[in-house]
Amino acid sequence: LGMEASIISSIGNDSSGELLIKQIKKFEINTTNIQKHPSLKTGEVKIVINENGIATYQILSPVAWDEISITKSGFNEVKKSSAFVYGSLSSRNEHSKKTLLELLKNAKFKIFDLNLRPPHYSIDTIKLLTKNADLLKCNQEELLFLSKIYGYKKNDLKQIMIFLSEKTNTSTICVSRGENGAILYQNGDFFEHSGYKINVKDTVGAGDSFLAALIYFQMQNFSLEKSLKLACAMGALVSKFDGANPKISTNSLISLAK
């Protein structure tokens, strides 16, 4: 979509790391703050796609991104950025968790993309990262998990979102609902989109693309309703193709979102 982006992470001193950097640069993403670990290998995830196009993940450990260090360059990158997106997976190791918490202190707008990948999380860490967020993005299962760990008994989606917003002081919560679209809550108001009917080929990357589009259009001062509609369109388009990063044209996005 054209927004300038930068990644803070760590790769191994290996061929996989070199290949990853080349691939990231193809998308014109700043790799300055991707560190090279002297001993741990580049992260690897084994993905299995079922007959419905739904993915399951086996995330190897330990890997280079378990030991992301704080650097002056990374610190400054976060400080100057309009938004800082972080996930829960990177906090499975204390080294990277400590770095993340330091970076969050200087972020202007903090976006938490919750990804529960057992056994790579702890409840205390999830609570800590949620309370740091200005915007929380999760799916329905993850929302129910959050309501459970905070002791909320009801199953109504909207009531859970209101409760969590008040409990964690998170002003905006966005819940993706797969083929049924998404719902967003901000300061007492709800925005919903029912999604787009498409032939799903591969869901890997759809959630990330959805969030990226939501952030982009919000940064372009689109209304929340319009931003959510376009984000759902982006997630749907990505699901039509194999792989997490298919090339999606602006025209195809706008055409689907009409």
Q: Language model features by range: what are they?
A:
Residues 17, 43, 100, 143, ...:
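A general structural signal for well-ordered alpha-helical segments in protein cores
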Residues 154-258:
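Conserved phosphate-binding/catalytic region of the ribokinase-like
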Residues 1-45, 49-54, 62-64, 256-258:
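Substrate-binding N-lobe of the ribokinase-like
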Residues 14, 40, 140-141, 208:
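Alpha-helix N-cap/helix-start capping motif
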Residues 23-36, 51-191, 222, 253:
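Ribokinase/PfkB-type carbohydrate-kinase core domain
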Residues 46, 57-60, 193-194, 214:
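Beta-strand scaffold of nucleotide-dependent catalytic cores
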Residues 11, 89, 198:
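Hydrophobic pocket-lining residues within nucleotide cofactor-binding pockets
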